[in-house]
Amino acid sequence: KQKICATIDVHNIDTMKLFLDTADTELIEKYYQTNLIDGVTTNPTLIMKSGRDPEDVYQQLIDLGIDDISMEVVGDFDGMFIEGLRLFRKFGKSATIKVPCTPDGLRACRELARDLVNVNVTLIFSPAQAILAAKAGAKYVSPFVGRVDDNSFDGIDLVDQISDIYSIQNIRKTEILAASVRDVKTVSDSFGAGA
């Protein structure tokens, strides 16, 4: 199943970005050829379920010209940090390392960012988590809009709150990448809320 993620720098509309959230390389190639897709977020578990090696998929995406690929790492701090550095060294600036918003994930984000590695902090369910991720040096925060909605809260309101906080606090280095987006209306609403 593919999804579209949306991000926008609230200070510069020209930086609006669309990311695909899928492991389907044929679909990625199809949409990337439109010149409207700015990046891809991936999940190694989904890639492996398709019978492919995640690193082969990453290389195929880079060969297509995609230069912003969120590559998820898992484990404790040491595991995420070491794997994140390894992926960055192998794939260069095309690798944005995706970590969960957990204490170990935030610590890994901080250390990777110090090594100039771009990091996407995922599993954001509150403004407080987005603040911590920005403080840790994340390039992207990924609030899970659809999952927030599933739990009887307003995912778009979450994006709006994060956007307001980032704007008030002049946080410019961290972009909001709305995740778990399930339909076109939510993509539009996410952009309207500052993602």
Which residues fall in each region the model found?
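Catalytic cores of alpha/beta
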Residues: 27-32, 83, 108, 126-136, ...
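Structural motif
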Residues: 72-74, 98-100, 120-124, 177-179
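Histidine/lysine/aspartate-rich catalytic loop segments that bind and position anionic ligands
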Residues: 123-158, 165
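Active-site beta->alpha loop and helix N-cap motifs at the rims of alpha/beta catalytic domains
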Residues: 16-19, 24-28, 34-36, 41-114, ...
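Active-site capping/gating regions of soluble enzymes
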Residues: 142, 174, 191-195
